[in-house]
Amino acid sequence: YRQTMKTVVEPQLAALHEELSMPLSDGGSLHAELYEQPTATRAVVILHGYTESGEKFREMTWYFLQSGFNVYAIDHRGHGKSARQFKETYLTHVDHFTDYVQDLEAFMQRIVLPRTQTLPVCLYAHSMGGAVGGMMLQRHPEMFARAVLTAPMIAPSSAPFPQFVGAAIASVMCALGKSKELAFIGKPFDPASETFESSFSTSHARFDYYEQKRIHNAHLQNSAPTYGWVKEAIGVTKVLLDKEK
């Protein structure tokens, strides 16, 4: 797997790769990676999951390119190379979950739609990205021709506590002014404690390949939420299950 990624996938991606930073209205910028080919017949926007980055989906990007897509991937704010509020890159924070959705709206309007023109645009969103994508579809049901949400974060876990307990703890801590502090369920990035066996991965080779990138790149080391992120993430459930939306 590693050899194929290094000798086939990565070189082909590099030939089409374009990076850009889209300024955000509240400061900082959103990092995006674009892959465009003249023979494309459609386009796809990739939204990664919690503590991930667009970098994790490079293999998936290659498959999409092979299938005739142009690919547009972002790092959500507080992830990857996008704007952060802290120097500690293991912390994952957002003031309002809707910030993710507004970032995506801006990315679509300013970058994707002008570039894709008449191409049908699809959405591929994973985990937390699935929650962002779901809220985007509520706001703009006509924007995407197709949408695939893999393991969407509709009811995030606050283990070891029941969700209502996790929500209560996070709300109290936020009320006490600790919204940007490390939450009780998280810990700093530690490669020694991140093993294939404790992960949700089903491929040891893929886990090792991305984990090595994380070890050597601080911007890929998100591993823990703040109380503010926990509070906002748990609040997503009510929004996504609202039948009126």
What residue spans do the PLM features occupy?
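An N-terminal hydrophobic leader/cap segment in hydrolases
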Residues: Y1-P23, G28-E36
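Alpha/beta-hydrolase active-site loop
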Residues: T92-L113
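Glycine-rich nucleophile elbow surrounding the catalytic serine of serine-hydrolase chemistry
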Residues: A125-M135
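Alpha/beta-hydrolase-fold enzymes
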Residues: G133-Q221
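Conserved alpha/beta-hydrolase
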Residues: G54, Y63-K87
